[in-house]
Curated annotation (Swiss-Prot):
Its EC number is 3.5.2.9. The keyword Hydrolase applies. Keywords: ATP-binding, Hydrolase, Nucleotide-binding. Signal peptide: none annotated. Pfam families: LamB_YcsF. This is 5-oxoprolinase subunit A. GO terms for biological process: carbohydrate metabolic process.
Length: 244
């Protein structure tokens, strides 16, 4: 069994360098919620050095709230903004001898695209326009995954080690109780259940079906690195290979 482990980079976390030794893919902030041209260049350089798959992490234009504000923008605006961000990172990667492999939207752009078909279509169209060989990463079972498949893109269905799930397989909003799993044992058990058995227990007790092709590891928690190391060790014991 194989699983991809991904993390978000270039968002001001001190643990970025060490996290890169534990993941197989990383998503680089492209300036709209965090980061800038210099951090993008630095992140690409480190990903190449560590043999980690390079990915873009485009967002709504929302630096003030770290890309977590809901927005209702015309699909053509989202298309242009997404193409702008991923095109910039693709060029930065190419200039350093690397290749951008995937795109994973950030924050509310990710969450809204999971449920809003028009938004999902705009993102998938931008990814396809940039490079049809790119992998589109989205919430397992979401509209974004469906849109990617409609454009013939390779998709990668994502699950979260430290997020609570609702009965329909969507994430519990960060504003609600149960959104974040802070107990390490619970997060580890949930991750193994999703990867090995394709299901997750919701906060209301029902089982939701999920297709786990990549696991998101957040690097900004107090015990994030320790958990990442433990998850890697657990996967090794279970014979689960970590690779992009």
């Amino acid at each position: 069994m194989k699983i991809d482990l991904n993390a978000d980079l270039g968002e001001g976390c001190a643990s970025d360098a060490e996290l890169l030794t534990l993941v197989s893919s990383a998503n680089i902030a492209c300036g709209f919620h965090a980061g800038d041209a210099q951090t993008m260049q630095a992140c690409v350089r480190e990903e190449i050095k560590n043999g980690v798959a390079i990915g873009a992490h485009p967002s709504f234009p929302d630096r003030e709230n770290f890309g977590r504000s809901a927005m209702q923008l015309p699909p053509e605006t989202v298309y242009a903004q997404t193409l702008y961000q991923i095109g910039a990172l693709a060029t930065i990667a190419r200039a350093q001898g690397g290749v951008m492999r995937h795109v994973k939207p950030h924050g509310m752009l990710y969450n809204q695209a999971a449920k809003e078909a028009q938004l999902a279509d705009a993102i998938a169209r931008a990814v396809y326009a940039c490079d049809p060989a790119l992998v589109l990463v989205g919430l397992a079972g979401s509209e974004l995954i469906r849109a990617g498949k409609q454009y013939g893109l390779t998709t990668r269905e994502e699950v979260f080690a430290d997020r609570g799930y609702q009965a329909d397989g969507s994430l519990v909003p960060r504003s609600q109780p149960g959104a974040l799993i802070e107990n390490e044992e619970q997060a580890l058990a949930q991750t193994l259940e999703m990867v090995q058995h394709g299901r997750v227990k919701s906060i209301t007790g029902e089982w939701a079906t999920v297709a786990a092709q990549t696991v998101c590891l957040h690097g900004d928690g107090e015990h994030a690195l320790a958990f990442a190391r433990r998850l890697r060790a657990t996967f090794a014991k279970k014979g689960i290979v970590v690779a992009a």
